[in-house]
């Protein structure tokens, strides 16, 4: 083995160890914080059961066209997979929460590893969300919007989950900035960039 080959092998091992450590760190934090929460959607539950870590961005529409659209990345061992998943919640439509409505999406491993590193560095599992109320904590009374979509960040392990949500996060971040919401938008934008999809509402 040449010196160059040796150095390359050391770099590869170091990168792998770093990614594994980040995954372990995120999983440990989520395991502790999210033990009392459950997942109602059977498709998301299946992803949880079949992977070590699931990270997802969901756009939730509950006003006119009731639906949830997910962009998902999932890690099992050292492999990442991406998915697009849409659930139609309209009563006069067939139930959409079935395996056939989840579609694989190409994802870049380096980008997924970078997202995991970002989540670890920023401790994104501590994002609180607005819980459907108190959208503008600074009391800006001119900051109002109706019938907008909500957004949710899912970080799921086999033992727990965190899933902070914000109503119209881009709108409210513009008129009354909030540190947690800004981090939420930063993380979910990275997920959108990784799982390229056409036609998902923001």
Language-model region placement:
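Bacterial Sec-dependent N-terminal signal peptides
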Residues: 1-29
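Function-determining sites in protein domains
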Residues: 20-202
